[in-house]
């Protein structure tokens, strides 16, 4: 069938990242697929009551896409898969997490470039959004995964200064590499605190851990992804931090 990214007609599963009105009844919808990456398409009838529920960020859909010319905006029809984010409608905090995840992916990922790791990271986050005790930490790992997928992965395997593997408690804001307690002590005020959950999935979360993790991923998203594009972090990402603070989840 050839390269799926170059095909002018295809069918695939996708997550909705965003939808904005276009014309009287249509919308331009950004979708994240596993094989084709982020794809935008015009969806007719998107304003209808039937379609609105599965045009929300994080909804999983079957996409049937067609384009006349490679590189130009194509059209698509969408069919829902499962309940989608409607199951979270009573959980405003989880919805804020889902909206932030979709907004960051929509703003960070390039068009028509396969990033299967980003697709699976979003999938993993959505699966745990109904578990309030753990999803904020998974969200941090999601953003770290996006950085990795885009070529800006954090190196938390050992101390950048000494090569030590133990007692890693900082991250260099310049390089994204871990720093041990001993090596980082003289530069404590200039380093980013590294929460233990970013090193291991074992153990619980302490107060301040999620905030520290979001500070790390937010810093490097700004430095490596959005800064070069002269863009700030998406508003939905900033709102998530506010909502988590209000819920005492940081």
Curated annotation (Swiss-Prot):
GO terms for biological process: DNA recombination; double-strand break repair. The keyword DNA repair applies. Keywords: DNA damage, DNA recombination, DNA repair. InterPro entries: ARFGAP/RecO (IPR037278), DNA_rep/recomb_RecO_N (IPR022572), NA-bd_OB-fold (IPR012340), RecO (IPR003717), RecO_C (IPR042242). The keyword Methyltransferase does not apply. One of its GO terms (cellular component) is bacterial nucleoid. Involved in DNA repair and RecF pathway recombination. Belongs to the RecO family. This is DNA repair protein RecO. It comes from Caulobacter vibrioides (strain ATCC 19089 / CIP 103742 / CB 15). The gene is recO.
